[in-house]
Amino acid sequence: GFNIVRRNLFYESRGGLVCRHGHNNIIDSNVIIGNHLPATLGIRIINQGHTVSNNYVESVTGKGSGAAFILRMGVYERPNTSEDYEDEKLKSYHRAADIDIAFNTFVDCTELNFGDGRGDKEPRNVRFAHNRIYSPNTVPNIKISNPTIFPGITFINNFCQFKNNESPNIKGFQITTFNIEQIKAQRHQAVSPMDCGTSWHNVELSEMKTLTELMN
């Protein structure tokens, strides 16, 4: 836990940015571009104490647990004692709780999913606020897979644009008309290739050229 994942580029990735093993992570200002390729993934939220903010997700095609965004149902409570840890599988999903998801942008994605996955531990104290969802050529892509997520999640002042100005009919989402150029300007927020990646990997010139081309 306590990881910071900030200002990275995920391009045509079939692997997601997943908060699974650990708590209190910061997922901030990342760019995820799926280019409409099959089974591309976005951000999957499980466990507790995360902040997910200012991320840009575009043309991701996955659904359910592989959607552009997913808040997953939990299988276990967060362990508190040594006995809890011994009884729990390492790959388990803890209840999602105490999470802020705010100021993110989703463009032309197939689905944003709330409540998918096996398990009966619904989220608690989760806020999805001030996010932008732009999919003008499709019907509303916000899917509530499990209604027991309420009242554990609150949607606050989110803005969306769908085909024919159709509404998702979920409290906390407002229909609007976006300036697409302003929306897509956020895809350039990833840092320069020289500043990307792990501290132990030196970026080669060929990698710099490729990453720069992807962002233009």
What spans do the regions from the language model cover?
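Active-site and glycan-interaction determinants of carbohydrate-active enzymes
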Residues: 186-216
